[in-house]
A protein has these predicted regions:
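Active-site region of PLP-dependent enzymes
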Residues: 1-112
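Short beta-strand-to-loop capping motifs
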Residues: 22, 115-119, 197-199
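Alpha-helical membrane insertion/targeting regions
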Residues: 85-88, 125, 148, 152-153, ...
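Structured helix-beta-strand junction loops
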Residues: 93-94, 137, 191
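Conserved PLP-binding catalytic core of the aspartate aminotransferase-like
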Residues: 100-177
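PLP-dependent enzyme catalytic core of the Aspartate aminotransferase-like
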Residues: 123, 160-205
Length: 205
């Protein structure tokens, strides 16, 4: 299964919502049932006419907006790629700013253009101050992602009755402690500056 978001920052958007695609008819029928209030779908009937589900049906107006945007998706993706290549070639000349490197023989659609910021090359200027300076020049940017295992949701799950029934206290503690070892993730989250995808649709000059 593949999952796609149509939230308002995405390449094609309906404001909110998303889509699931796949080549497993049984799984797709289950997804269809779940998003349609648990009603039977295809070969999936649950324990009767209704099974567990909710109303996640997309409205026709949203679908029409999305279908119209498909016509320009390929062209806009190519524009993003060319502008990202141009931007990377120029940013590589600036010490302290490192564009994202793509694996060989891969292509990016650039939902986000990330770069690594090295404060040491800017006399210790904090990343937040660097981003404020970019915004002052009309360049939208953000710190993008943070370490989501610190936002309370994980602790809530670990401390829940369900988790504590399934796993021993020792195992849950070991899992929580293991998160302190994700130093690479912490480095990326603290040094990345992200440019939004719509910036790559603009003119170079």
């Amino acid at each position: 299964l593949g999952c796609f978001s149509f939230q308002n920052s995405k390449h094609i958007t309906s404001g909110e919502g998303g889509a699931i695609t796949g080549n497993n008819e049984d799984l797709l029928d289950r997804c269809n049932s779940f998003h349609n209030c648990g009603r039977a779908a295809g070969s999936f009937h649950g324990q009767g006419y209704f099974t567990r589900g909710s109303n996640y049906r997309m409205q026709h107006f949203q679908a029409a907006m999305l279908l119209q945007q498909l016509d320009k998706l390929v062209k806009e993706t190519e524009v993003r790629r060319k502008n990202a290549d141009y931007l990377s070639a120029n940013l590589q000349q600036i010490r302290g700013v490192t564009p994202a490197r793509l694996p060989k023989d891969s292509r990016a659609v650039w939902h986000l253009y990330p770069l690594r910021y090295d404060a040491a090359q800017f006399s210790g200027l904090p990343r937040a101050a660097f981003m404020r300076a970019l915004r002052a020049e009309g360049v939208p940017c953000s710190g993008v992602y943070h370490e989501q295992y610190y936002d309370g949701l994980l602790n809530e799950a670990i401390e829940s009755h369900g988790f504590q029934r399934l796993f021993s206290r020792e195992r849950l503690k070991a899992y929580r402690d293991s998160l302190q070892e994700l130093t690479g993730n912490q480095l990326v989250c603290s040094t990345t500056v992200g440019l939004p995808q719509n910036l790559l649709l603009g003119q170079r000059r």
